[in-house]
Amino acid sequence: MTGKSPEVIPHTPVVQDLRAAREIFWINPHYRATKEFKEAQFGISLSDIHDAEERLRRFAPYLAKAFPETQPAQGLIESPIVPIKRMQSYLESRYGVQIPGDIWLKCDHQLPISGSIKARGGIYEVLKHAEETLIKQGLLTREDDYARLKDSSFRDVLSHYKIAVGSTGNLGLSIGVMGAELGFKVTVHMSADAKGWKKALLRSKGVEVIEYTSDYSKAVEEGRRQAEGDSRCHFIDDENSRDLFLGYAVAGLRLKEQLEKLNRKVDADHPLFVYLPCGVGGGPGGVTFGLKQVFQEHVHCFFAEPTHSPCMVLGLATGLHDGIAVQDIGLDNKTEADGLAVGRASRFVGKIMAGLLSGAFTVEDAELFRLLQALDHAEGIQCEPSALAGMAGPARLLLCKEGLQYIREHRLEEGLKRGTHLIWATGGSLVPVEVMKDYLSRGK
């Protein structure tokens, strides 16, 4: 992460709209509907994703013992996909557009252990670090039954090691809960945007929470700096972590299985459109990478960001990646979507997404609350504000000339009628009842 402001900021129409905090829909001019992925291009391959999936399966017996809520899925951390027909009708009415195809919800707000998409990457990296530490000490082999890790002797060993992370909330929750359960001493550096209940939950698990009055980037920077001087401290770097990225990418393999079980095809005649909330980029970037590996040119991924924190679309649209922050164009990086309150995108993720991401759009906070309330009313599903960022995606795609041009260019007009729109809901099941009541009241 450079942390530097650019000397010259491009004055393109999209940057001007972002500067004015207007809602935009941006199509990536560098998107390539490629069938092939060269490992040298990304430094990450499909075999790396399979390796991550195998590691999660090795840990499944342990997770089933440590977290009973994972037992229905035999210790796998996974969420269902559900059709949301009533919400689709609401979106068509609200935005005044017919949406061909079916809208489904990917329920990562229900993920066990930490209740958000961050359970995928955050928990994976903690598990990998624990495995490597114990194997190095000769206390574990990959052939062992990992259920034995619940034994207190392993906790005693890992209690001599530390894990640190910078977070706006959900990543810290997933790493804190998992790390503390394994016995690690965990420190979460939290930005000013982090919700009080998330800090309280972490502290109740014995996690050290260090609060900052500044934003996410500062929390990460401080966490990284403090960890550098301690050889026993593993810093989980949300801006640059390959392991976090791979943990998220496993979702691509899992989604393929889920869609097959539901007899929902993904091919040239049945395109898949996926709408993902985006903060620094690791979660949606990893998921997108996994999806593109599995479905190739038949999946079309779009990131959704708050109008006041559009760091990824700003980095991609200017080509500056982490060389520009939203503050450089006069935005305050203040949003109720705490998981998306990031001013400077990950360069690591931005570079990989440069040719894989179909586009991105921004959403006003007030609209997030309206959609949050509507989802509860239509489907009885409750999510936190960040999780609603992608909800308007199918309508927004069809309402702008750029989106319609994208559909024509990729010959999707007919396929769209048989296609699937998947809204990725990123968090919400751990939100306290009183906080959720407040969210719902703000959407009326």
UniProtKB/Swiss-Prot annotation:
It comes from Desulfitobacterium hafniense (strain Y51). The modification N6-(pyridoxal phosphate)lysine is found at K118. Its EC number is 4.3.1.18. One of its GO terms (biological process) is D-serine catabolic process. It catalyses: D-serine = pyruvate + NH4(+). PROSITE patterns: DEHYDRATASE_SER_THR. Its cofactor is pyridoxal 5'-phosphate. Gene3D superfamilies: 3.40.50.1100. It holds the Pfam family PALP. Keywords: Lyase, Pyridoxal phosphate. This is Probable D-serine dehydratase. SUPFAM superfamilies: Tryptophan synthase beta subunit-like PLP-dependent enzymes (SSF53686). PANTHER family: D-SERINE DEHYDRATASE, THREONINE DEHYDRATASE, MITOCHONDRIAL-RELATED. Belongs to the serine/threonine dehydratase family. DsdA subfamily. GO terms for molecular function: D-serine ammonia-lyase activity; hydro-lyase activity; pyridoxal phosphate binding.
